[in-house]
A protein has these predicted regions:
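A beta-rich soluble binding module of mature secreted/lumenal proteins
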Residues: 8-163
Length: 163
């Protein structure tokens, strides 16, 4: 009963994804510039997510960052992604621990595939990523406001320093 009540009390929404993702163009390195982090990445610096399309259609992700500071110990994780059929490649299940697949929704993607926002309906985590290590301040504010407009609380929103 407690789990049921807790689940009902969690904030959730249906965040709209982009219409379509060209999966091949999305592959490669993305610098995480800001996020509402999961526990694992709450002290991340130099965070980079790298995606590679496997022959079976799954996505090999390598998530690397320095823990605690720009020169902190390097942490690396290798979750596996699965595109959800019928979503035009815009919704994935990201598997860190078998058999659980966490929702991963591509909710913003510029036409040049240089900036993206990945979010979740639970409004618990979000990632602003770019192909470059920095964005101009006005763009960072624009995307922060966009994330807030999706319904996210910005209490734990954090920009990630990149070296």
């Amino acid at each position: 009963l407690i789990l049921l009540l807790t689940g009902c009390a969690m904030k959730s929404t249906q965040i709209k994804t982009v219409d379509k993702v060209d999966i091949d163009r999305f592959m490669g390195d993305w610098y995480v510039l800001a996020h509402i982090p999961s526990y694992v990445e709450k002290n991340a610096f130099n965070a980079v997510e790298s995606y590679k399309l496997n022959e079976d259609g799954s996505i090999a992700k390598t998530f690397t960052f320095n823990e605690g500071s720009l020169d902190g110990p390097v942490k690396t994780y290798h979750p596996k992604g699965f595109v959800i059929p019928g979503t035009n490649n815009a919704i994935w299940g990201m598997q860190f621990i078998w058999p659980i697949k966490a929702q991963y929704k591509i909710v913003y993607l510029d036409k040049d595939y240089k900036i993206t926002i990945v979010a979740r309906d639970k409004l618990d985590y979000v990632w602003l990523m770019a192909r470059s290590k920095t964005l101009p301040h006005d763009q960072m504010i624009k995307f922060r406001n966009m994330i807030e407009g999706m319904g996210y609380s910005l209490d734990n929103y954090r920009e990630i320093e990149q070296e």
